[in-house]
Amino acid sequence: MGVSQTLHRISASRNRHGDVCGLTYRVGRHIPGIADSIFDVVAKAASCSSGSLLLVGPPGVGKTTLLRDVTRQLADTFHKLVMVVDPSEEIAGGGDVPHVCMGTARRMLGTPRQSKYEVLEEAVANHGPEVIVVDEIGNAKEVAAIKDIGSRGVTMVATVHGTSLERLLDNSVLSPLVGGKQRMVIGDFAAAQ
């Protein structure tokens, strides 16, 4: 649950009976200009209709903080129609009004019954964005939705948990985000070519 008018979130841990037995408070950060170091990469993603940007890193290293500033750059500097798919209220904060760090980007929360991939599909079907931003891609349905949306010419900007590109490629669910990996056997003649 997002904390209204902030970037912070509170999550409950529950026991097997459904009773709350712990709370986690995540402090969201807005650091204006943090994406300036990758401005050329953001500019390239903004300039091509099939370009996408995937931020990979372990939990807690600042992927979402960077994602917020990339979103602002795409919306305000490059004047793109940016839709932030944010069902967990982690990117743009809690409440009905997105945090000011989003700039002119729009946000979709979805309904409590919708999954993230359903909100992704609704965003492209009903709102015509040039760019869709989403945090923490983690399952096959979300990966399939992202690949489908990207094939329609919408730029995708997303984060995913991982420690390296190599490890991401070894993950059969997430590897399609970076083109995938397939095993091949090549004979001596073909290898010499």
Region locations from a protein language model:
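P-loop NTP-binding catalytic core
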Residues: 1-52, 85, 95
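Conserved P-loop NTPase nucleotide-binding/switch module
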Residues: 127-190
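Well-ordered alpha-helical segments embedded in enzymatic catalytic cores
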Residues: 66-69, 115-122, 145
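P-loop NTPase switch/communication element
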Residues: 74-123, 169-170
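Long, charge-dense
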Residues: 23, 27-37, 97, 106-110, ...
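Glycine- and other small-residue-rich loops at beta-strand/loop junctions that grip anionic moieties
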Residues: 56-59, 109-113, 134-136, 157
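Conserved catalytic network of the ASCE P-loop NTPase/AAA+ motor domain
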Residues: 46-48, 74-77, 99-103, 122-127, ...
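P-loop NTPase nucleotide-binding module
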Residues: 27, 37-88
